[in-house]
């Protein structure tokens, strides 16, 4: 049996024995949040923010995970870095407000907040399906690496557990008390209702 993909009329179709079978997508299915690591060999050594992605790309990597989830299109840290360069940094640091502005400019369905300082408000956005960037210092979790400054992506909240993508460590889940014990500086949420 011969099977191939066709893009006739802009709609992907599978053809088998000359008959087109339309490809069906579940548009209502929630988008998955990928786990990208800033140290990944595919992009870690790429120059970024005066250093490289492995060293300085926590915000870029978090933005790539968020934008991939929000758009349903794959935006790896490599692709995002090649697209935005250093324009989403300020004084060599990741500027999540600039990343949010870039995302909104490229997808008119997205909205973002200003800086948020209330943990419960940030978790509320994560519980609604928005992507929330969290700026923190110290350890994200007991036994984890200590950071002088770090950006993570809070991508879920079920009322008791925060689902976090740490671009340095991967997926981390924190309960309410663990989340409250993190030294958070600010949050910024982006998404659509």
Which ranges hold each PLM region?
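Active-site-adjacent structural segments surrounding the nucleophilic cysteine of cysteine proteases
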Residues: 1-92
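Conserved active-site-adjacent core of cysteine acyl-enzyme catalytic domains
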Residues: 67-193
